[in-house]
Every structure is written in structure tokens, then in C-alpha cells.
């Protein structure tokens, strides 16, 4: 733990030096009151937003829904909707802010994951320089290969990208929707329709899907 703390302090120090250099290159006075602590703050924020690069993937702990040998939850759709996430666009290192919906079909094992485990997985793959299309693919693949042993997985991402919001075309309305499917969701369109209906049931007032 002490070694990790020392490594973190060293990373903050090294990144802060470079942030200070960048500020100076764009013409800022890094000694003025408002910027004195900015390099260190930026370094800490960047490390927090990319923490997954230095951490293992969280384990998806599962449990069985079947109460006895004669009961079955096979083929049940489990949906975790409106998981908020933030990430960094790998092209400009500007924020991506949105929501992810994760659905899976329970397999023969009758196993499901706790709600927090799915949320942690989403946050893990978001905590790095990322593109949204890859994000939903990585989440879907991780769940498909997990101990849940689902028959299929469907992941939908809907987000605003600050790289088009504050620069370039400066569009304030456009959002990106990405979809990834695995297993039975790839072969049965009716299941995808069911998930979309579930997502829109009791839909919260939101900018996102």
C-alpha cells in the first residue's frame, strides 16, 4: 500500500510538470493565483479518469436465482438501465458523458450478477481513453465471458461527446448511440425489441436514451 502511494505521488508530480509546460506553451502565466495548483489538480483528475489502465478488471460475482432444482429462471431478461458514465475521448482527451443500458438473457445455470457488479464493470471500461463503440463492445464481451454464462448480451450506449460540443462543429444537440450484441440477441431481433420496450418503460426525464 505504501509503495502504491509513493508511485501515485510520483505520477502526480511527473504529470503536473508536463501540464505546467503545456499551460506555459499556450501563453499562460502559471505563477498567477488561479493557476498555481492547476497542474497538480489536472494530474490527479487525469489519473482518476484513467484508473482502469492501472487496475485489474473487477470480478463479476454471481448468484443463482433458482430457489430449487425444479424452479427455473432460464431465458429471463435482466436489464440494468440508465447506468451513468463518463470517459475520455481518446482523440482529444475531452469528456464523454452519457448512459449505458446492459441486458442479458439468463442461461441454463440460472446465474445472475449483482447490480453493483454490472455498474462497476461499466465504470471500469469507461475509466480510460476510449471511444464509445469500443466501450459497448468491451462491456458486452466481458459479460458474455463471465460466470453469468448468459445466452446473450446487449449493451446500448448513448452519450454526448465534448469533442464535438466545445470544439470543431460545436454541435450542442448531437449524441452518439452505439449498440453491441452477443449470443441470442444477435440472432433474435424480437429480443432486442423487448429490451428497447423495457428501457422506455417508466423512462426517466433525461437528455439521454
UniProtKB/Swiss-Prot annotation:
One Pfam match: GTP_cyclohydroI
GO biological process, one term: tetrahydrofolate biosynthetic process
One MF annotation (Gene Ontology) recorded for this entry: GTP binding
Pathway: Cofactor biosynthesis; 7,8-dihydroneopterin triphosphate biosynthesis; 7,8-dihydroneopterin triphosphate from GTP: step 1/1
Residues that hold Zn(2+) according to the record: 89, 92, 163
Catalytic activity: GTP + H2O = 7,8-dihydroneopterin 3'-triphosphate + formate + H(+)
UniProt-listed PROSITE patterns: GTP_CYCLOHYDROL_1_1 (PS00859), GTP_CYCLOHYDROL_1_2 (PS00860)
Keywords noted in UniProt: GTP-binding, Hydrolase, Metal-binding, Nucleotide-binding, One-carbon metabolism, Zinc
UniProt EC number: 3.5.4.16
Keyword Hydrolase: yes
HAMAP family: FolE
Family: Belongs to the GTP cyclohydrolase I family.
Subunit structure: Toroid-shaped homodecamer, composed of two pentamers of five dimers.
Protein name: GTP cyclohydrolase 1
UniProt source species: Sulfolobus acidocaldarius (strain ATCC 33909 / DSM 639 / JCM 8929 / NBRC 15157 / NCIMB 11770)
Gene field: folE
Amino acid at each position: 500500500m505504501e509503495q502504491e502511494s509513493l508511485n501515485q505521488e510520483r505520477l502526480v508530480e511527473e504529470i503536473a510538470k508536463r501540464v505546467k509546460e503545456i499551460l506555459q506553451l499556450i501563453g499562460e502565466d502559471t505563477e498567477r493565483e488561479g493557476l498555481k495548483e492547476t497542474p497538480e489538480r489536472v494530474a490527479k483528475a487525469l489519473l482518476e479518469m484513467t484508473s482502469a489502465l492501472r487496475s485489474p478488471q473487477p470480478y463479476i460475482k454471481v448468484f443463482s436465482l433458482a430457489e430449487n432444482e425444479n424452479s427455473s429462471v432460464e431465458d429471463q431478461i435482466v436489464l440494468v438501465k440508465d447506468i451513468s458514465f463518463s470517459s475520455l475521448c481518446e482523440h482529444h482527451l475531452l469528456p464523454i458523458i452519457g448512459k449505458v443500458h446492459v441486458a442479458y438473457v439468463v442461461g441454463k445455470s440460472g446465474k445472475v450478477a449483482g447490480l453493483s457488479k454490472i455498474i462497476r464493470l461499466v465504470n471500469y471500461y469507461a475509466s480510460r481513453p476510449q471511444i464509445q463503440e469500443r466501450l459497448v463492445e468491451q462491456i458486452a464481451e466481458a459479460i458474455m465471458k463471465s460466470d453469468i454464462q448468459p445466452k446473450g448480451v446487449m449493451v446500448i450506449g448513448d452519450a454526448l461527446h465534448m469533442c464535438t460540443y466545445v470544439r470543431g462543429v460545436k454541435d450542442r444537440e448531437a449524441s452518439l448511440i452505439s449498440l453491441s450484441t452477443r449470443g441470442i440477441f444477435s440472432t433474435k431481433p424480437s429480443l432486442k425489441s423487448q429490451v428497447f420496450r423495457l428501457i422506455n418503460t417508466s423512462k426517466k426525464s433525461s437528455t439521454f436514451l
